[in-house]
Amino acid sequence: MNRTALYAGSFDPVTNGHVDVIRQACRLVGRLVIAIGVHPGKTPLFSAEERAELIRATCDPIAAAEGSALEVVTFDDLAVSAARRAGASLFIRGLRDGTDLDYEMQLAGMNSAMAPEVQTVFLPASTGVRPITATLVRQIAAMGGDVRPFVPELVAERLEARFAKP
C-alpha cells in the first residue's frame, strides 16, 4: 500500500473518536498525514505543537502496528492545499451520525470541485465513540469531570493539568 491520505481537523484535543478514525485509516493506506488546522481567529486549548505531540504519542504505535507511516503537520490554509503538499490522493473523514454526513457531503463536494484528484473516504465511527466530540470533552474537563472514557490517557492527564484548580 503506497497510497497517502490526509486527515484534517483541529484535534483540540485528540479524542478516542479521532483515534478510531486514525486506526481505520491506517489499515487502508501506506501513509497517513494528520493535518492540524491552525486558524488565527480561534484560541485553542492546546497549541498546535502540543496537539501534534499528543497525536504522535497516541497514534504512532497504532500506525506502526497497522504497517502505516504516520506524519503530523499543521496547515493554515485550505485542506486541499495541505493534501496537495502532502501528496495525498485521499481525504479521510470520520462520520458519527447523519448530521455529520450532511456536513461532510457538502465539504466533500467543495473539496472535489477544488481538487478533483483527491477522493474523500468516509469512515464510520465505531459504536463506542460515536457520541464523543472534542467540544464536549473540553467542557467536561473544564467542569472537573472525568474525561478518561473519551480520550487517550495522556490527553486526560494533560486536560486535568490544564484545568487543575490552584
Curated annotation (Swiss-Prot):
Task: Return one GO MF term.
Answer: ATP binding
Question: Quick check: keyword Nucleotide-binding in the entry?
Answer: yes
Name the species this protein comes from.
Methylobacterium nodulans (strain LMG 21967 / CNCM I-2342 / ORS 2060)
User: By what name is this protein known?
Assistant: Phosphopantetheine adenylyltransferase
**Keyword vocabulary terms for this entry:** ATP-binding, Coenzyme A biosynthesis, Cytoplasm, Magnesium, Nucleotide-binding, Nucleotidyltransferase, Transferase
Where in this chain does the entry annotate a coiled-coil region? none
What gene name is given for the protein in this entry? Answer: coaD
| Similarity section | Belongs to the bacterial CoaD family.
Q: In which pathway does it act?
A: Cofactor biosynthesis; coenzyme A biosynthesis; CoA from (R)-pantothenate: step 4/5
Subunit details for this protein? Homohexamer.
Q: What is its main location?
A: cytoplasm
Functional description taken from the UniProt entry? Reversibly transfers an adenylyl group from ATP to 4'-phosphopantetheine, yielding dephospho-CoA (dPCoA) and pyrophosphate.
| The UniProt record lists the keyword Oxidoreductase | no
